[in-house]
């Protein structure tokens, strides 16, 4: 697979993670470099590892995995999005709000947004080319976009301020719905 094709694949796979990093940026009150790095590393690493896992599984499990991967992504993103919306409407302590820096939350979001990368890895297993190059490029592009996305999201969160978590929750649910509909055969473009 040539580098240009892999770059476009990487950008496509990174799009959902970028959108989620924007949402994460909305929720961070005091942005610091280490917070953006943590989010970007989670997404970049998962996006880099999942194609390798998919490639390793190869054609043997393609039909099995593709029959339910979209439901997992939809469920995880809808759950977290719904939780964000619910928590933004509560008048509870701030520490109970959506925390995009929590390792459990980050892992869940990273898995949900990298399921397409797993499927892409299965597809890559039938092509000639370097899986190492593909995984590296996918990981670095996702890392870069997510790092920038956290800062952009934070900036918009500062500007819009009130109830931005509702917007973030809706974005996550929409991403999950998009993944589900695309895998069910609906074209959204």
Swiss-Prot record:
Entry GO terms, CC: plasma membrane
Compartment list: Cell inner membrane
Alphabetized GO MF terms: manganese ion transmembrane transporter activity
Source species, domain of life: Bacteria
Keyword set, alphabetical order: Cell inner membrane, Cell membrane, Ion transport, Manganese, Membrane, Transmembrane, Transmembrane helix, Transport
InterPro entries tied to this protein: Mntp/YtaF, Put_MntP
Membrane topology label: Multi-pass membrane protein
Predominant localisation class: membrane
Ranges that cross the membrane: 8-28, 39-59, 65-85, 106-126, 131-151, 166-186
Annotated family: Belongs to the MntP (TC 9.B.29) family.
Functional note: Probably functions as a manganese efflux pump.
Protein name from the UniProt record: Putative manganese efflux pump MntP
């Amino acid at each position: 697979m040539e580098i240009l094709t892999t770059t476009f694949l990487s950008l496509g796979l990174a799009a959902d993670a970028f959108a989620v990093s924007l949402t994460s940026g909305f929720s961070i009150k005091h942005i610091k470099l280490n917070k953006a790095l943590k989010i970007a590393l989670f997404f970049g690493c998962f996006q880099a590892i999942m194609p390798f896992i998919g490639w390793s599984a190869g054609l043997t499990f393609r039909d099995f995995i593709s029959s339910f991967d979209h439901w997992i992504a939809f469920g995880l993103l809808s759950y977290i999005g719904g939780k964000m919306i619910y928590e933004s409407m509560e008048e509870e302590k701030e520490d109970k709000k959506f925390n995009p820096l929590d390792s459990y939350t980050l892992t869940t979001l990273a898995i949900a947004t990298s399921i397409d990368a797993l499927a892409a890895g299965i597809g890559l297993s039938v092509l000639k080319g370097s899986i190492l190059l593909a995984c590296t490029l996918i990981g670095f592009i996702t890392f870069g976009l997510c790092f920038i996305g956290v800062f952009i999201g934070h900036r918009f969160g500062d500007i819009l301020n009130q109830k931005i978590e509702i917007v973030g929750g809706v974005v996550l649910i929409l991403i999950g719905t998009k993944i589900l509909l695309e895998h069910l055969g609906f074209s959204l473009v």
